[in-house]
Regions:
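Preference for bulky hydrophobic residues occupying beta-strand positions
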Residues: 7-9, 169, 214
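Compositionally biased, intrinsically disordered low-complexity regions
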Residues: 24, 107, 114, 179-182, ...
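Conserved histidine-centered catalytic loops in small-molecule metabolism enzymes
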Residues: 104-106, 186-220
């Protein structure tokens, strides 16, 4: 009762998405970014978090020639309704649509009269938008394939929830070490049995980078 969920990561070899100061554009090269846009065109919805939106003001569209009309519905998980009317997601909300998922009772004044569709769902134990509630609502709206492009917190949330079916991992041939920011935050692993388990389905060069495709599997 939920869409097929894909998580896209673009990192260094050691799994970093940005420097400690937040610089991230661009770790992977043009070919990997083009492949990422193709992934967007192949999904009904793209999911990100409000932290990414406030930091980067992304368009979250497919910008490949001939595929702009295949841009997915843009979905923002925004527990406290912090998305503003000046963001790209708000100013272009009609084409493609933008859906804002907030916790029930979140404030309403930030968006004004923009065309964003607001969707209220229950909160989880951390007072954040409940990921499973969002996925259920997306399925009810006819979404069958959703792509997650998000920061460490939301990526970790999807991994922890066990809802990531496919993982697309673009790795650049560079190493950042402890100076970098990890692609995923804490997912509550205290024992090896708690880890998220995936099986490698394919790996291929993409320009100077490498794409690894994994599918979710049960723990041994």
């Amino acid at each position: 009762n939920r869409p097929l969920v894909s998580l896209k990561l673009a990192t260094t070899l050691d799994g970093c998405i940005a420097t400690r100061t937040g610089e991230s554009q661009w770790i992977t090269g043009p070919a990997a970014r083009q492949r990422g846009h193709l992934l967007r065109a192949r999904h009904d919805a793209i999911i990100t978090g409000i932290g990414t939106v406030l930091a980067d003001d992304p368009a979250m569209t497919c910008r490949l020639p001939g595929l702009a009309s295949r841009s997915p519905i843009r979905t923002v998980l925004d527990s406290r309704a912090r998305l503003t009317s000046q963001s790209q997601l708000a100013t272009t909300a009609g084409d493609p649509p933008t859906w804002q998922y907030t916790c029930i009772g979140a404030p309403t004044e930030n968006l004004g009269t923009t065309a964003i569709e607001r969707c209220e769902v229950s909160a989880d134990q951390n007072n954040q938008v409940d990921i499973n509630a969002v996925l259920t609502d997306l399925a009810d709206r006819g979404i069958t394939r959703a792509l997650v492009e998000a920061g460490p917190g939301l990526s970790a949330g999807f991994l922890k929830s066990g809802t990531v079916d496919t993982l697309y991992w673009f790795r650049a041939p560079v190493v950042m070490g402890a100076d970098g920011k990890s692609a995923a935050a804490d997912i509550g692993v205290s024992d090896l049995a708690d880890m998220a388990h995936f099986a490698l389905d394919a790996t291929m060069p993409v320009g100077e980078d490498r794409l690894e495709i994994y599918s979710r599997r049960a723990a041994a």
